[in-house]
């Protein structure tokens, strides 16, 4: 196949979106944007990106930020392990590299939370290094370009595709080339069997288009079935606020805050009241109101939630819990998106 970079770059320079991390592609800006964009659309990321940089404009500020504030700045983006790894890496960068990301692919790759793709994006876009940056968009483009039925989630297939990506990369324009492939996958060679081939600068050399197989590519492994977990919530409110507790520092939703809940079972109202009493809580005489059922899908787990809302008298919080006002829930305590259906009741 002829080299695709001239046609690809010509298209990119005419059609690329104006994005803040492209207009000012410092290593920190590219790093932050790539981490935020994992599992999240550009349009959803931009408000968070601006807000995050306004408060944490550089790597030393990120390294010094208190964890609770860091979670609050990330609230709504989900996948909070991303921002925890971001801070771990920032602390190492401050300790080892004077607060500046190293201009070296292997050194970037060694930092917490920075995988092959993110390291490649930083190294090529910010430092101009001729390295690959292969994400799902790029894999989809090359799967169709070469009409390759390989399962793109398999390491050997990804390695082969990466080699093909590098065959076409102009070393002096590595960053632009990598971004152009990502942009092509995001805007034209889109997923779900509906590529906009009429707008594609590579249409004339695309083997899947010639074979009529674009709708079947790329091939992906069948997803594993999610584990279904019943969850019972209790939105307990007193004049002091809502009763909340912090989740453990490791595991699902680590370090975030939640209402009273019990994972693994759906409880009747009487059972909820008995459990609250066992915590030492005076539930008063007001009858609880049933919460609407809701669900939240994690990567491999699906929560099916139900529960109650009730008002209780003024009292001390049970051990391990705190009373949080609506204002504190808005500004201080980070509630994960898993409770999105109930946030209007809490905020």
Label the model's feature ranges.
Residues 2, 6-198, 202-211, 215, ...:
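Catalytic cores of DNA base-excision repair glycosylases
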């Amino acid at each position: 196949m002829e080299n695709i970079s001239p046609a690809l770059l010509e298209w990119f320079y005419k059609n690329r979106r104006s994005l803040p991390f492209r207009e000012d592609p410092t290593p920190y800006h590219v790093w932050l944007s790539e981490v935020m964009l994992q599992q999240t659309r550009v349009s959803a990321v931009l408000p968070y990106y601006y807000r995050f940089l306004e408060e944490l404009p550089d790597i030393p500020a990120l390294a010094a930020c208190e964890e609770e504030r860091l979670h609050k700045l990330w609230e709504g983006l989900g996948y909070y392990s991303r921002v925890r790894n971001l801070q771990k890496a920032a602390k190492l960068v401050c300790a080892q590299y004077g607060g500046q990301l190293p201009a070296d692919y292997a050194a970037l790759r060694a930092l917490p939370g920075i995988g092959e793709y993110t390291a490649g994006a930083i190294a090529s876009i910010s430092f101009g290094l001729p390295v690959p940056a292969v994400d799902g968009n790029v894999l989809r483009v090359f799967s169709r370009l070469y009409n390759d039925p390989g399962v793109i989630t398999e390491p050997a297939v990804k390695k082969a595709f990466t080699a093909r990506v590098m065959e076409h990369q102009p070393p002096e324009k590595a960053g632009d080339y990598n971004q152009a492939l990502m942009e092509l996958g995001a805007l034209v060679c889109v997923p779900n069997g509906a590529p906009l081939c009429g707008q594609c600068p590579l249409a004339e050399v695309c083997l899947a288009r010639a074979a009529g197989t674009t709708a079947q590519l790329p091939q992906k492994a069948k997803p594993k079935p999610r584990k279904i977990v019943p969850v019972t919530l209790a939105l307990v409110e007193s004049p002091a606020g809502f009763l909340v507790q912090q989740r453990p520092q490791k595991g699902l939703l680590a370090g975030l805050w939640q209402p009273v809940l019990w994972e693994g079972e759906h409880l009747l109202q009487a059972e909820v009241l008995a459990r609250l009493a066992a915590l030492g809580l005076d539930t008063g005489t007001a009858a609880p109101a049933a919460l609407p059922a809701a669900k939240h899908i994690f990567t491999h787990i699906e929560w099916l939630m139900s529960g109650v809302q009730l008002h209780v008298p003024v009292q001390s919080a049970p051990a391990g819990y705190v009373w949080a006002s609506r204002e504190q829930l808005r500004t201080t305590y980070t509630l994960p998106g898993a409770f999105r259906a109930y946030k209007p009741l809490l905020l």
